[in-house]
A protein has these predicted regions:
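Conserved P-loop NTPase motor module
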Residues: 461-517
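Conserved catalytic network of the ASCE P-loop NTPase/AAA+ motor domain
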Residues: 154-155, 181-185, 212-213, 325-327, ...
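P-loop NTPase motor domains
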Residues: 196-208, 221-398, 403, 465-471
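Basic- and hydrophobic-enriched, low-structure N-terminal and domain-boundary segments
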Residues: 1-163, 173-177, 368-370
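Glycine-rich phosphate-binding loop of nucleotide-binding enzymes
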Residues: 134-222, 467, 488, 497-499, ...
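Conserved ATP-driven motor cores of ASCE-family P-loop NTPases powering translocation/secretion/packaging/pilus
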Residues: 79, 396-481
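Hydrophobic residues in beta-strands of the RecA-like P-loop NTPase core, especially within AAA+ ATPase
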Residues: 192, 376, 411-412
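Conserved nucleotide-binding/hydrolysis micro-motifs of P-loop NTPases
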Residues: 40, 50-52, 94-97, 195-199, ...
Length: 517
């Protein structure tokens, strides 16, 4: 359906269409539209919808005679058309040569009065390519139902991120992404499951987790002793480094950090926590160590005393070895935090230790391990400018990912608190609604047409995501697929993947898996 005609055009600044809609509410930001040029179809996104200032409108507003003398939108006055009309600013995304069907970047403009219409399913099918490793993420905003797909193989080749404020649906989006990765066999995933979202069933909304859909591909370990079905997680304290404690505690002063490193130098094979507790000024004998710093460090280290999973093991073989064995078999791992899910210190502590040990192995013996995507929630806690020097594993992962099969995936609501260096390495960004201008700007740093996308991101509704990067043909606003059993089976798993028998067996023990009865 024709919605208007082009009245201004610029390769740099975009197009302006005079709308012929009776109601401008029919058109919204980020809707895809087609401008029919002489040779090309211009695939565009709506950047803005506006009613320009009008002296006549100013004079008539509030007048008792306005309803009598103002022509309705459908009423034309001679050759000039309606007196009052709306306009739309359009951003050109792709050109489609109508003769050859080839796609190209916008390097020209359509003629004056070129017709503008809503994009149809046929239009978008010409734009998006589907590969053997593509998986559905949702439908395109403003188009009759068309399921748009991401190339999961390309997605997991380089670092990527899911950004969005709290409550926008990041967990649901991430479950769809993980399901896509596993269904296409392009890699395994390691998820630090803080809130019981990814195992068999979600503890919050009871939706299905990864173990439900991929019972033979996913192992679950748990920090919480009440989870009787998952394998217990044990961490040998001898594996702890000063950096692990600095990242976990987050509030060590510079003198405390200096003291910690001094103590670590002389631990002689003992675990660092016990060594700190037993340290004294007499033993240290260092001018750099002060009594107040030592006592403050001991008090903070005492926070770890309540963690039941810190246990020395035979030959130092803790749960990391179980995780490694699963990864070697191309399995994915969900680490359930159970009752520790609300404890930020525990999350930072465990995630940093396991990630560091994985990084060391992958960089030393890269050829031995399959591709693994490491999902990091609350990423800014590890990657802020203040902590990043100590959590150097993640900074190096972002910078040097092409050398290994270990890929960093960030999930965060405050991208502005992630260091510029790390954000600059992201090849794909899945950006949901953000309200803080600094977060919007940070999430889109380095993105073409940044100003347009800033406006779109700030106004995205819930469960909607802007996908920008090389895993999709063009930047796209997507209504995220409703996450349920039927949709995941139909649009992501396909035929022959779902093991009904195994799932039914797992489902019988769902309550025990989470220990929540």
């Amino acid at each position: 359906m024709k919605i208007g005609e082009i009245v201004a055009a610029s390769v740099i600044d975009g197009l302006v269409a005079k709308l012929q809609l009776g109601n401008p509410e029919e058109l919204k930001i980020a809707f895809p539209v087609i401008v029919e040029g002489a040779r090309y179809d211009f695939y565009c996104l709506v950047e803005d919808v506006l009613n320009e200032e009008s002296d006549i409108a100013d004079q008539l507003a509030g007048s008792t005679i306005a309803d009598v003398i103002v022509p309705r939108p459908e009423t034309h006055e001679g050759y000039g058309g309606p007196i009052f009309y709306s306009k739309a600013k359009l951003r050109m995304i792709q050109l489609v040569d109508r003769e050859t069907k080839k796609l190209s970047e916008p390097q020209t403009i359509p003629p004056y009065f070129s017709a503008c219409r809503h994009a149809t399913r046929d239009d978008v099918e010409r734009i998006y390519e589907v590969t053997d490793t593509s998986a559905t993420l949702g439908t395109i905003t403003g188009v009759e139902p068309f399921h748009v797909q991401l190339d999961m193989k390309k997605l997991v080749e380089k670092p990527f991120a899911i950004f969005g404020r709290t409550g926008t649906g990041k967990s649901i989006l991430n479950k769809l992404v993980c399901a896509g990765i596993l269904s296409k066999d392009v890699g395994s995933v390691l998820i630090f499951d803080m809130h019981g979202e990814y195992g068999v069933f979600s503890a919050t909304d009871k939706t299905e987790g990864l173990k439900y859909f991929f019972p033979g591909k996913v192992d679950i370990l748990s920090l919480d002793p009440k989870n009787k079905e998952a394998r217990p997680f044990v961490l040998d304290p001898r594996e702890i480094t000063p950096e692990d404690l600095i990242v976990a505690l987050q509030d060590l002063t510079s003198p405390m950090v200096d003291t910690l490193y001094e103590i670590a130098k002389g631990r002689a094979g003992r675990d660092l926590i016990s060594t700190v507790k037993d340290a004294s000024m007499e033993v240290l004998g260092s001018e750099r160590t002060h009594e107040m710093s030592l006592q403050g460090l001991k008090r903070r280290i005492g926070r770890l005393d309540r963690l039941p999973f810190l246990k020395e093991t035979k030959e130092g073989k803790d749960s990391f070895n179980q995780i490694l064995a699963a990864i070697r078999e191309s399995k994915s791992v969900v680490l359930d935090f159970g009752d520790f899910g609300t404890d930020q210190m525990v999350y930072l502590f465990v995630a940093n230790i396991l990630s560091r040990r994985l990084f060391d192995l992958y960089t030393e013996r890269n050829e031995d391990f399959p591709r693994l995507v490491l999902f990091l929630e609350e990423a800014h806690k590890f990657l802020s400018p203040e902590i990043a020097p100590y959590a150097h594993t993640f900074s190096r992962l972002a910078r040097e990912t092409r050398k290994f099969n270990l890929i960093l995936a960030l999930i965060d609501q405050r991208p502005s608190r992630i260091s510029d260096e790390v954000r600059s390495q992201l090849a794909n960004r899945l950006v949901m609604s953000l309200k803080e201008p600094s977060d919007v700007e940070a999430a889109l740093a380095g993105v073409p047409d940044k100003k347009m996308w800033e406006n779109i991101i700030a106004k995205l509704p819930l469960r909607t995501v802007a996908v920008i990067g090389d895993a999709i043909r063009i930047p796209t606003v997507i209504d995220v697929l409703s996450y349920d059993d039927l949709n995941v089976r139909e649009h992501i798993l396909g035929a022959g993947i779902f093991d009904e028998g195994a799932v039914q067996e797992i489902a019988k023990h769902a309550d025990d898996v989470f220990g929540r009865g």
